[in-house]
């Protein structure tokens, strides 16, 4: 068990005193392989560490989405015409980005007991892209009128791509941990 703790400390800490090139002291990781229980403990540690980190990033991004969405709603009250429509599209785009970032959605809804409406992250992303295109089209057509607002309207596009990248990054980490579980070997210490 102490060997596992030393191994975990070496891997998980970002200390600069990690020894390389044959330098050894008593705290170095043993060259003996980890047994199956130690492997499972280490993989579970990686999994919980990744889950906590993902949750932190998603919560921080959600707060950022809510704050910027509130700012856009304040700007909606002060603006007129087409810019108001673009700001509303930007606020709705932020809502869609936040929903797809936080949740994995696959729901079926019955409309008027005849039509079946399937709502998933893919369909929310399609709506989000339509809103972003509408917002960009309006903002670039009226760039002469209000340049500050046009710059504010570029942030929802950036935050959409951030949400997509964070979601993909979280899925990649989950896949890597699943691959790590498949690579476990059978070894028992005496």
From Swiss-Prot:
It is a multi-pass membrane protein. Residues 1-55, 102-123, 171-190 are cytoplasmic. Coiled coil: none annotated. It is found in: Membrane. Keywords: Membrane, Transmembrane, Transmembrane helix. GO terms for cellular component: endoplasmic reticulum; membrane. Disulfide bonds: none annotated. The chain crosses the membrane at residues 56-76, 81-101, 124-144, 150-170. Its main location: membrane. Residues 77-80, 145-149 are extracellular. It comes from the Eukaryota. Present with 238 molecules/cell in log phase SD medium. This is Uncharacterized membrane protein YGR016W. It comes from Saccharomyces cerevisiae (strain ATCC 204508 / S288c).
